[in-house]
Amino acid sequence: MADLDWLIARPVAHRGLHDQKSVIENTPSAFAAAIAARYGIECDLQISADGEAMVYHDDALGRLTEGCSRLDATTAAELKRAAFKATGDSMITLGELCDLVAGRTTLLIEMKSRFAGDRRLGSRVAAVLSGYHGPAAVMSFDSAQIADLRAIAPGLPRGMVMEKQGWDAFAAAPRRAMMTFAQALSARSQFIAYAVRDLPALLPTIARGVFRLPLLGWTVRSTDDRRKAARYADQMIFEGFRP
């Protein structure tokens, strides 16, 4: 098991350190603010039509930017020209994010997925991070993406993003069955990011306690969330305040 103490050494700013006003999520300004405050950075990636890893959460434009097209139907050059509604920032690529961070803090990168078998994003992430020398880890809700990443970039730290929703069948499973599942999970993943609202839960408890997988709680937004993360996880992914 890789030593991932660096991954849980400091609180991680969810989509950068943003305020939903002058500093918008997943923008260079939010990432610069997180670096200045000495937090880790969590960000989201979507694939563009031409196979570039773009730093953006939604699978389509519109919520934060002008336009309404799907990211996977729009080229990287077009996406970089899409104006944010409330800031002068532009959308950036993973490579540009790596240049901005330059190893000054932890990068926790979530690969978004439509669960449709498109594996281009993992390949692009592996290619970009192969030339990056700062601390970085990749995670996804899509277990197939993580399995692919293990195959093409076995040295790249990888983890699963999880929540109770969608796992209700496992919630009632006997402990032995949950132990078997957690063991299989640990074979693919080196850490888990679990919804703090669903903690404590049996699966992350076994993964953390038995298989020693680092556990991050997301997204911590309240005093109660923070208390739960401190008790049941190794670190928090936070938003809306400064820990």
Regions found by a protein language model. Give the residues of each.
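Phosphate-group recognition and catalysis centered on beta-loop-alpha active-site segments
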Residues: 1-243
